Amino acid sequence: VAQTCEHLAAFANLPEPAPITPGECEGCIREGTTWVHLRMCLACGTVSCCDSSTARHAERHFRETGHPTMRSVEPGEAWRWCYVDEVLG
């Protein structure tokens, strides 16, 4: 069941940014690591790897930038996540 929070609600009606590195995690490419699934920051379009990936670049991006929300960019998935409130939307 999808939930919401103020962060997810703030991005709900805004156009999504274009993915900066479609189809790949820039951090993994730079560091020579591999990703499991990809996520995209809804604030800036940074594409990063998920928490199941060794490097967890999406979470790292949140910690470094404070950008609170991301979405899955996996085919057939449209869910969003808020790192601040730990809510799936």
Name each model-derived stretch.
Residues Q3-L14, P19-T21, E31, V47-G89:
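Cys/His-rich, Zn2+-coordinating zinc-finger modules
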Residues C25-C28, C41:
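Short cysteine-rich clusters marking metal-coordination/redox-active sites
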Residues T33-L42:
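Canonical RING-type zinc finger of E3 ubiquitin-protein ligases
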